[in-house]
Regions:
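Mono-ADP-ribosyltransferase
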Residues: 1-107
Length: 107
């Protein structure tokens, strides 16, 4: 299986609807603030994430199941990294640009 052998910082832009869904999904979980049931499509490069109002900066520990898609699709410019489904995220802080999150677990 594909895992990262180093810590990563990944970026994800989401619309308000998706962000609210992620919060709703995590509502009954005591250990996380955001929960994504599907795969989490992110960018390895800051400002290459999808340009939505809500932007997540996700700290991903080494050993996380994820795959770099930038060399297998025709969208190299996104530097896409897909994180395994069932991602649990903890919000650490917020700044004027990003909601800073730590990835806790995946499936």
């Amino acid at each position: 299986s594909h895992t990262t052998d180093t810590d990563l910082v990944l970026y994800r832009g989401v619309c308000e609807h998706v962000y609210e869904l992620m919060k709703q999904n995590a509502k009954n979980m005591t250990d996380c603030d955001l929960y994504e049931k599907g795969f989490l499509a992110t960018s390895l490069v800051k400002n290459q994430e999808l340009n939505y109002k809500i932007k997540l900066r996700i700290y991903v520990p080494s050993g996380t199941k994820c795959v770099y898609m930038g060399n297998v699709n025709d969208e190299q410019g996104f530097y896409e990294v897909d994180i395994m489904h069932s991602s649990k995220l903890k919000i650490i802080s917020m700044d004027h640009e990003y909601i800073n999150c730590k990835l806790l677990t995946t499936a």
